[in-house]
Structure formats: structure tokens, C-alpha cells
Amino acid sequence: MTQREALPLSDVSVVELGNIVSAPFASLLLADLGADVVKVERPGSGDIMRNAGESGEAVVNAFNRNKRSIALDLQSDRGRAAYHDLAEAADVVIENLGPGVADRLGIGYDDLNELNAGLVYLSIKGFQPGPYGDRPGMDMVAEAMSGLAAMTGRPGDGPVRVGTSIADIGSALYGVIGVLTALRERERTGEGQFVDATLFESAAQWMGYWATYADMTGHDHPPLGSSHPAFSLYDVFETDESDRWVFVGVTTDRHWPAFCEAVDRPDLLADERFETPASRLDHKSELTEAAAEELADWNREDLVDALLDAGVPAAPVNEPSELLEDDHLRETGMLVDFEGDHGGERKRLRTVKTPLSGDRIETEQRLDAPRLGEHSREVLADSGYDDADIDSLIEDGVIELPDER
């Protein structure tokens, strides 16, 4: 049994026609669980993020591990025919093309369903069909329209984008739930189906309780920064090193005296303004100011240790680079090594894999992030094309291999 065959989705084949984050992330989740994922890219340029600077390269590398890449010209008849062959043999197709693009190319769900009635087709768009259905969608569009950006950041600073492509990633997660549901339903009926996942509706659901809050109270809540409206001492605080921060979360009656003891501030515990949860909320700004003044003299690691030893929720505010040296992630097997592209060179890289595990559920790092078209010949050979057919496609520019660019 091969490494992939031991994984839960080893019998699932996926064709991904994706760019940027949402579709690539969706297929990555399936790939980490063992699915055979073929990423279809445009010859010459590939995924948009391949040509979007270092941050784009990071996205391509981190989100396209465990996949094979074929560079295939879908504007050509022979390229579309090859794509049809791939989809005909696949269990799942995932795409995040613009509204109507797949249908205009003749590779949309209706086209592929005629070839493969069992196909599960995930389409990730900005919006579900409706008044906004034809609008272009991207992560910040969803964050803006859902209210997420308005609630992020500190009061008076204006709307702020979340520090990762959260609406893209969320739509991918919902999309994968839909794919797995459709595959389960196919076991009963033998039929595939169209699955719709969107950025705006995903972000809108997450903001649902704030919409309910506005409905209840008649007004929107202001942005929260790093705080929480239900708790008096729940924020990030700068320590004695510049730009080294700690989160502290005092959320129960037990946490409050434990916090005061841990930071050796019995005066705060004795202060009548902070005697009860309600009074602490009434004097939240004063309490936060007093805590900030005290914690500014603490070393970050010493403070976190003292609070955790006292049973008070606390955490260092890490930079992404610190994840790669995190003992917990290392010991739980969450950090993986692979090879990817950086500045025209191949380089050993690290990232965090899909965090799913169970008695018989594993995720594994198997394949490096592919070069554009690295597996074009291999993928078509798996689909029954002989060397002469493949050479002809290369000669006509329908497919591309890295050494022929």
C-alpha cells in the first residue's frame, strides 16, 4: 500500500481549475486527506499568484502542495477536449472562475455532467445567484459587504481587512463540506451534483450574530479591536519589549483574583470599581488602562507563564514566522517540509498542514508544490494519451512542460 492509499480520500480524484486562494485551498484540503488532485493552469503564466511577488509565491507554494500541475490551453479545441477527458474520469471538479466563464468555454457543469453523471462540481464564486450574482468577487469585497471589515480594527481607525484571506478560505471550507456531502449522497443515488460556495454568504453567516445584535438593539456595535464587549479585561497588551504583545482574557470570577495575584496587584482586587463582573464592565476603560500600565513592565514570556500558571487565559501574540519554530505544532506533526518556487529557484520550505486527525483519519505531506506544467505529460498519460499524442499537444502549444517554456 502506498502512502496515499492509506489516507481516507485516496480513492477520490479531483480536477482543480483555480486561481489565488479559494479553489486552491479547497482542493488542498482534499489533497492532504489523500485525494489525487490535478491542478489545471494556463500555459505561460499559470495560477495568477505565480506572478504576484513573494506573497503570491507563498500562496502558490503553501496551497498547492500535494497536487500535480498540468499547463493546458483551454482556449483551444484540443485543450478543451483534454480537459473533458480529465473531468470525465474525475470524482470532483473545483473551479473559481468568474461568473459565466466556465460555461462560455464549454467546460461548465452542464457540459461536464453530460460526460460524467457522477461528477461532483464545486463552483466557488463571490455571490450566489441573485442581485449580486454577476459581480466579481474577491476576499475584501466579501469582508466589506458582510460587515466583517467594519467590525475589525479599533474604533475611529476605519474598516480593516483581516490578516489572511479569510472569506476565500471560509468559502473553501464550506465548499469542501458540500463536496463531501455530495460524495456521500452519490453513494446512495449514483449521481453527482453541482455544489455552490460563495465568499459573501460565507462571511455574512459569520457576522450573523452581529446582525442579530443590531436587530435586537436597533444599532450596530462599534468595532472591537482586540477586545470583547462581554468581558472587562480581554485585550492585547504591550510588554517591556517593543512590539511584543500578550493577549489576556479574564472571563470568569475565578480568573479575576488569579490575575491580580499573578501580577502582584492586590490593590486592583481591592478596588471597589473592579469588585464584580458588572462593575468591572462599567469601568472597563480604567481597568484596561491600569492593566496596560502594569503589564508594560513585564517580559512577554514571564507574563504568559505567570498567567497560565495561575489558570488565566493568556497567549503571546506571535508573528507567522514563530509558527515554524512552535514546539506544539512540531510535536503534533502539524509542520511539514516541501519544495517550492522562490525567485526562479527551487527551495525547501515549511508550512502548516490541514489540522484533521482521528482514529482512522490522517493528513500527509506527499508532493512538493509543483512547477507550472510539471506533470503535464504524466497526467495525460494517466488519461490514456500516448507519447505521440502528448508530443503533438506540446508542439501545438496546447500543453506545456517546465523545460519547454
Q: Which sequence ranges carry the predicted segments?
A:
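Terminal low-complexity tails and localization/encapsulation signals of metabolic enzymes
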Residues: 1-13, 222, 238-240, 324-405
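N-terminal helix-loop segment corresponding to the beta1-alpha1 unit
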Residues: 1-178, 182-191, 371, 377-405
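Glycine-rich beta-alpha junction loops
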Residues: 44, 126-128, 199-204, 241-243, ...
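Short, surface-exposed beta-strand/loop micro-motifs that present aromatic residues
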Residues: 61, 232-238, 347
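Substrate-binding/catalytic subdomain of NAD(P)-dependent oxidoreductase enzymes
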Residues: 183-224
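Conserved PLP cofactor-binding pocket of PLP-dependent enzymes
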Residues: 308-332
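Aromatic-enriched alpha-helical interface/lid elements that frame and gate functional surfaces
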Residues: 233-310, 314
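Active-site Gly/Thr loop motif
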Residues: 221-234
